[in-house]
């Protein structure tokens, strides 16, 4: 572990020197690239230096203990020595987690797709609740959300809705939402007070750079049409909505805002994200066939969470986490769940690196 940490610290120092070089400073691409890399190493280097300083402090205190005969000073030094010794395993544990390979997609913006599944109108209403929950959560992180495509339900909510979330580390925060979400509650129209169960599926796709996935113009079929809202009512009076079909795969992306130019850009962005996601899903399926992750397989059909309204309870089935905070969670306070899932995944990866042992 410490050989790795020495390499990280050496690279950090190299980056410091490079970021002082006028040739780098005057090249925006290189400046951004190296600044980003340095920022990613900063935490690891800070903790490693704290660890090394703590070990040095322990050696100094031990030397002072050998040299002194004063009882009061001995007592004080023993307390300091114990405090420093207690700090070491905590720093070592933190360093282990910091050395876990980072998901290369973590810093990317995302496309979130929510679809009503089983449950009819109630599922559509729940899809709307999930969209509101994620929008509120994005606000707490100062992320920007932008609706790409929406199909409203006649009785409220959405049959499906796609939206982008932009901000530093958006994928790292939202990637655990992939899967089937189940709600248990009494519908407003239910006179008998019976609890209904409905589901909605969530897909979180990392946005991609052009260099990461090639989409040739000749492989695209682009159609324009007049979009319609709930009940078939026309939202636009011109054919501004755009549908892009990737001919080799049959993958389709649409956008139906007012500007045709913006719709082309949005639809193409979603199309690329879906094609990239297909590659990721193939890789994850191969990986899942070899081992079971603590936070699930990432399969869209996997039931990951239940929202029980009568008991104000939210349960994440992947890690067995139950919180009696449904109201807060539906208001976008997802940190406790996201943090627990992040820790579970990191612990899982750490076990893998250590051949099954922590």
UniProtKB/Swiss-Prot annotation:
<comment type="similarity">
    <text>Belongs to the prokaryotic/mitochondrial release factor family.</text>
</comment>
<comment type="function">
    <text>Peptide chain release factor 1 directs the termination of translation in response to the peptide chain termination codons UAG and UAA.</text>
</comment>
<keyword id="KW-0488">Methylation</keyword>
<dbReference type="Pfam" id="PF03462">
    <property type="entry name" value="PCRF"/>
</dbReference>
<dbReference type="Pfam" id="PF00472">
    <property type="entry name" value="RF-1"/>
</dbReference>
<dbReference type="GO" id="GO:0016149">
    <property type="term" value="F:translation release factor activity, codon specific"/>
</dbReference>
<feature type="modified residue" description="N5-methylglutamine">
    <location>
        <position position="233"/>
    </location>
</feature>
<dbReference type="GO" id="GO:0005737">
    <property type="term" value="C:cytoplasm"/>
</dbReference>
<keyword id="KW-0648">Protein biosynthesis</keyword>
<dbReference type="InterPro" id="IPR004373">
    <property type="entry name" value="RF-1"/>
</dbReference>
<dbReference type="InterPro" id="IPR005139">
    <property type="entry name" value="PCRF"/>
</dbReference>
<dbReference type="InterPro" id="IPR050057">
    <property type="entry name" value="Prokaryotic/Mito_RF"/>
</dbReference>
<dbReference type="InterPro" id="IPR000352">
    <property type="entry name" value="Pep_chain_release_fac_I"/>
</dbReference>
<keyword id="KW-0963">Cytoplasm</keyword>
<protein>
    <recommendedName>
        <fullName>Peptide chain release factor 1</fullName>
    </recommendedName>
</protein>
<dbReference type="InterPro" id="IPR045853">
    <property type="entry name" value="Pep_chain_release_fac_I_sf"/>
</dbReference>
């Amino acid at each position: 572990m410490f050989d790795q940490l020495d390499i990280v610290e050496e690279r950090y120092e190299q980056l410091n020197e490079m970021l002082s070089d006028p040739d780098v400073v005057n090249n925006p691409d290189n400046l951004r690239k190296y600044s980003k890399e340095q920022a990613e190493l900063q935490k690891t280097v800070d903790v490693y230096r704290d660890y090394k300083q703590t070990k040095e402090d322990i050696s100094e205190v031990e030397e002072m203990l050998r040299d002194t005969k004063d009882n009061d000073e001995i007592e004080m030094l023993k307390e300091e020595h114990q405090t420093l010794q207690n700090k070491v395993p905590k720093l070592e544990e933190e360093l282990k987690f910091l050395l876990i390979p980072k998901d290369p997609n973590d810093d990317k913006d995302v496309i979130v797709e929510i679809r009503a599944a089983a449950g009819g109108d109630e599922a559509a209403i729940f899809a709307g609740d999930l969209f509101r929950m994620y929008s509120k959560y994005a606000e707490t992180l100062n992320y920007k959300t932008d609706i790409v495509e929406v199909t409203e339900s006649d009785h409220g909510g959405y049959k499906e809705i796609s939206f982008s979330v932009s901000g530093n580390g958006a994928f790292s925060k939202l990637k655990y939402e992939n899967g089937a979400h189940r709600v248990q509650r009494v519908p407003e129209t239910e006179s008998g007070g019976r609890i209904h169960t409905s589901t909605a599926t969530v897909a979180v796709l990392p946005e991609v750079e052009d260099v990461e996935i090639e989409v040739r113009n000749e492989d695209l079929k682009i159609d324009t049409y007049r979009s319609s809202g709930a009940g078939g009512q026309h939202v636009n009076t011109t054919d501004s909505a755009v549908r892009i079909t990737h001919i080799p795969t049959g993958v389709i992306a649409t956008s139906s805002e007012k500007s045709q130019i913006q719709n082309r850009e949005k639809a193409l962005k979603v199309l690329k994200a879906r094609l990239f996601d297909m590659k990721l899903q193939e890789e994850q399926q191969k990986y899942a066939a070899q081992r079971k992750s603590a936070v699930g397989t990432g399969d869209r059909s996997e039931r990951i969470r239940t929202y029980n309204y009568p008991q104000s309870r939210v349960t994440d089935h992947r890690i067995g986490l139950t919180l009696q905070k449904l109201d807060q969670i539906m208001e976008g306070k997802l940190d406790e769940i996201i943090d627990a899932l992040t820790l579970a995944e990191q612990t899982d990866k750490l076990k893998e690196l250590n051949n099954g042992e922590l």
